Structures are given as C-alpha cells and as structure tokens.
C-alpha cells in the first residue's frame, strides 16, 4: 500500500487506494482496499480479441514500455520511497537470494542452472543510479482501458530499489515474439499478430528513457534464470502433491518448462 499510495500523484497509473486497515482481527491480517479499475488483463491469446487491429496491439506494447519508463523516471526520494531498499548491490543480492532459493527447492541437479549462476556472478555489470524497480513487470500485470492505454499497473509485491534494466530484461523474457519457440505453460498474448517485437520494445524504451541498455543481455539471462528457479519451486510443490495432481501431465510440463528456461538463460549468458 505504501508504494501505490506514493505513486498516486506521479505519471505512473496505479489503482487509487480507498483505505488501509492494520487491525488483524478484521481479516486475520492487515489489508487495504483499492478502487476497481475497469479494463482487461491480457494474459492469453484469446483475451486480445477485443483489440483486433494491428495498430491497437502495437500501441498496447508501446504503452507498456512508456509506462515502464515512467516508473523508472520517478525519484524515490521525492515520493517517500527512498527507504524502500538498498540502492547498491542490487544484482549481487538477487543472485544470492535466488541461488539460495534454488538450493532449497530443487528436485534434481540441473547443471545449466549452476553454470548460469557462475557466469552471472563473474559478469555483474556496473550499476548506475538506482530507480524504483517493479520486480515483475509484464503485460499481464497491467490493466488496459478500451483504448489500449495502461489504466493501472498492479502486483507491486516485489518492488524495490535497484537497476532498472532488471525490469526491462524480465519484460523481454515474458514477451514472446510470433514464431519464437514456445515454452510449456507460457502462451502469452504477444504471440498474436500485430504486437511489436521485443527488439522494438527495447528501441522504444531507449527512445523515451534515454537509458543505456548495453547490459540488457545480462538482465535477460538473469530473468530466465530467476524464472526457472521460481518454476522449479512450483514443480517441487506439485511433485509433492501440494496441488493434488501428483503424477499428472502437468508435472511433465513444469519439468520441461524449468529445463527450457534454464537453457535459455545459459544461451543468453554466452553473449556476455
């Protein structure tokens, strides 16, 4: 609630906060209420049918990038978010956190995951001035209006201060171009005709932000690696029967997804 409240008077579209309650006796935990934001979340190919024109879909992609640039343009100190997190050592902390998560959740040895970790450790880019980092910025974490404009950015749980390239890198991981090799469990809306390619998104980001993206490959590799580890955690819980479907075909999909994400990360580190 602190983040969305702080961003309410900036160029970043967020849902207005109606109220916040710290009394745990009400629901069992502190909670807040936001205003309802009208509009679709574009999570899968069938959900973009309401935007049938190629020009609309292109604008959706460009508006997504423009909004990301607006997040990174906010001065954390000016909006009361200067204490949101440490400003230095962002990548090192990410590597430590997710390597630890891998050791806790892995169900088998995957050399690619370890190799990527070693390569990322050896090639940490120099960090510039820290910005607000959303932490999970992708197409289906925003709400669009009927014009294809970003009405609200949601899911700020991973927000911190750090390197803005982390957001752009993860956006490139989630943004699948038409014709790209598909990954099981990942069928994003962007595979439909009309959406800009991820290379065009990067060009747009440079245009509107003026930022140096020379380290982007590093953060794309980091994004694939983190996502592989997250999916491994889901796969571990799935395999343990936490979802009541142990042994089903879904387990095979999770297994394949982790391996493919790790392979993508490994392939990307070869560019470093």
Each model region followed by its residue ranges:
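Short, flexible, glycine-rich and Lys/Arg-enriched loop motifs at helix boundaries
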Residues: 43-52, 178-193
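Catalytic activation segment of kinase domains across protein kinase-like and atypical kinase folds
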Residues: 143-171, 179-180
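Generic alpha-helical structural context detector
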Residues: 32-35, 66-69, 96, 100, ...
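Catalytic-loop of the protein kinase fold
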Residues: 132-134, 139
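ATP/Mg2+ or Mg2+-diphosphate-binding catalytic cores
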Residues: 104, 185-196, 200-212, 229-272
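ATP-binding pocket architecture of kinase catalytic cores
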Residues: 1-132, 145-148
């Amino acid at each position: 609630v602190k983040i969305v409240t702080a961003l309410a008077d900036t160029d970043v579209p967020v849902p207005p906060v109606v109220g916040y309650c710290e009394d745990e006796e009400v629901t069992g935990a502190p909670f807040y209420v936001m205003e309802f934001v009208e509009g679709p979340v574009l999570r899968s190919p069938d959900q973009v049918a309401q935007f049938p024109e190629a020009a609309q879909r292109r604008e959706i992609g460009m508006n997504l990038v423009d909004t990301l640039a607006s997040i990174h343009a906010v001065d954390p100190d000016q909006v009361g978010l200067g204490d949101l997190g440490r400003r230095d050592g962002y990548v090192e902390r990410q590597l430590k956190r997710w390597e630890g998560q891998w050791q806790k959740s892995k169900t088998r040895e995957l050399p690619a995951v370890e190799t990527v970790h070693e390569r990322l450790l050896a090639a940490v880019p120099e960090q510039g001035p820290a910005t607000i980092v959303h932490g999970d910025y992708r197409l289906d974490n925003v709400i669009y209006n009927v014009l294809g404009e970003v009405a609200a950015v949601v899911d700020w749980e991973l927000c911190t201060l750090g390197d803005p390239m982390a957001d752009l890198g993860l956006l490139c991981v989630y943004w699948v171009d038409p014709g790209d090799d598909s990954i099981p469990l990942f069928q994003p809306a962007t595979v439909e005709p009309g959406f800009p390619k991820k290379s065009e998104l990067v060009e747009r980001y440079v245009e509107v932000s003026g930022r140096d993206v020379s380290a982007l490959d590093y953060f794309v590799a980091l994004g694939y690696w983190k996502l592989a580890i997250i999916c491994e955690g889901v796969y571990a819980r799935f395999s343990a029967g936490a979802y009541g479907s142990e042994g089903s075909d879904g387990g095979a999909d999770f297994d394949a997804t982790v391996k493919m994400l790790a392979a993508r990360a490994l392939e990307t580190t070869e560019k470093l």
